[in-house]
Every structure is written in C-alpha cells, then in structure tokens.
Amino acid sequence: MTQSIKLSTDQMRMMSLFQNVTGAVARDCIEDEKQDRVIFVVNTGKMGLAIGKGGMHIKSLQNMVKRNVELVEYDEDPAKFLSNLLNNKLISEVKINTRADGTKQAIVMVDPRKKGIVVGREGRNAEKARLLAKRYFDIGSVLINSPERATMEL
C-alpha cells in the first residue's frame, strides 16, 4: 500500500455494520454513488465468512444499506489482488509494468469470449479494478486485453 487510506465517518459506520452482520472485519469500504453500490475489501481467507451460507450475510447487508454490496479479497500482491477483483477464473495473466514516466500500469489478459464478463455491464468491474488498483498500489491504468483483440484502456 503506497499511502494510508482515509475513511469518512459514514464509511467507518458502514464497516462496523459489515462486521456486526458478517463477523468478518472489512479492511476498507468504498461507496460508489455512480453505480449505487458499496464495495468492501476483506482480508485474505475471509470471503466465505463475509458472504455467509448461501449469501445470507450479503443479502441482509444489502437490505440494510439499500444498495448493492460487493466484496473483494485483498492480497499484498497487486497482480493477485486484480485477479481477485476481476474473477480469477476468467483471467489468464496479470502483468504490472512501470512506464517510462514512472507510473504503473496493469495489463490483464482474458479470453476474448469472456472479456465482456470481466469488464462488466457499463464497465462497472473495470471501473472497480481501476479505482482499487489506484487506491492500494498506485497503479494509474488497468488494461483489459485479449490476445486476439485490441486493448481497452481504462
């Protein structure tokens, strides 16, 4: 992590509610007004506890906050973190490069037939990846690429 993350009182309240409902500690909370969702980052190995049996914890949390709730499993390795973010079953490789100007760039390789799923409706998954990559690892851009198609830069 390049810098300390500052949380608002609303975000801290949301994290406290998350912990009370799920029993898992949220590492971070991002409120995405544009997509009407709340994204919680949980520590490695705590996804099952956070989700609950049959998604029970997430459903009750969504009912309480009246928004979609999304979870991401944190990892110290930026490539693994991005893979967790964008559905690691659909990703073949993640490369982190440093450009000549010193900024970092992530290149995510996916099967061309699955690219739409990885990017998400209206680019919501790609936007989440860009936001969290910047927040945790100071990665300026995330490229979702497939071997046979053109690169999509975010």
Where are the predicted features?
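RNA-contacting regions in translation and RNA-metabolism proteins
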Residues: 1-154
